Structure formats: structure tokens, C-alpha cells
Amino acid sequence: MAVVDLIDLPAIAPPNTPLVGLDLGEKTIGVAVSDATRMVASPLGLIRKTKFTDDAKALFKLMESRRASGIVIGLPVNMDGTEGTRCQSNRAFARNLLRLREDLPIAFWDERMSTMAVNRMLVGEADMTRARRADVVDKMAAAWILQGALDRLRNL
């Protein structure tokens, strides 16, 4: 399988199975999971980045435990719509995952402003300190990304 358009993901990923959302950071990978009906995304956890094969094994283990059938990866598009080096890095991550699991459907979702929005929410509504936010922002951003993709799929 290859990277697919988000709108094609429901036809490829088996029905009534969750999807996983990823926020790829420099040091961590934020992970979120949807419910089986693909209506609600919830933060699941963090994978502390080491080497790619270990990161992928940890991700696949999380996916198997939730019976997830596809991945939505946040794509950090620049504000002007262009793709920079972080987009290239996220696309390379997806290609590398597909080398290990060829049957895995992967789609991208524009994650512009997701981390900023989550930080504002955690400061404004949850009144979290910077240290505490660091522990949750990536998995919350992954949930934000996945929820945006789920909302888009629901409104097709």
C-alpha cells in the first residue's frame, strides 16, 4: 500500500476499526486513537524517539493493542501552504513505515497550528505549567490532528 488521500482512507482501512493519529516531534511521537466508529479521537500516549525501527515497533504494538487499521500523520505545512523540511521528514517517516508494513494505509492531515492551539488550550483552560504541558502537548496535538481528519471524513 502507499500513502493515500485522506478521502480514500475509509475505503481502504477496514470498517469499524480505529485509526491512529501521529504528531511527529523532534524527540517524541504523540499518538492518538479514534474509537471504532471513527467519531472521536483521544490522546493515547508518547513514543520517545530512539532509532526508527524501535519507534516503529512501539507504534505497531500500540496499533495492535487497539486493533487500529490505518494512520493519519500530521503534516506541518507552512502558513503560506508550502512544504518545508519538517514535511519532508514526516513524509520520509511514512515511507519508512511502509517498508516495514506494506499493507498499512497512511494519510496526511494539515496540522498547521495544532501544537499552538493545544498549548493555548492547556494554558488557558487547564492552567497547566510549562513543565506539565511538555508531558501532554504532543499526544494532545496528535488527538487534535486525528480529530480534524475524522471531522473532514464525516463531512464528505
Swiss-Prot record:
Keywords associated with the record: Cytoplasm, Hydrolase, Nuclease, Ribosome biogenesis
Location(s), subcellular:
Cytoplasm
EC number of this enzyme = 3.1.-.-
Single GO term (MF): nuclease activity
Describe the family membership recorded for this protein in Swiss-Prot or TrEMBL.
Answer: Belongs to the YqgF nuclease family.
Q: What does this protein do?
A: Could be a nuclease involved in processing of the 5'-end of pre-16S rRNA.
Q: What is this protein called?
A: Putative pre-16S rRNA nuclease
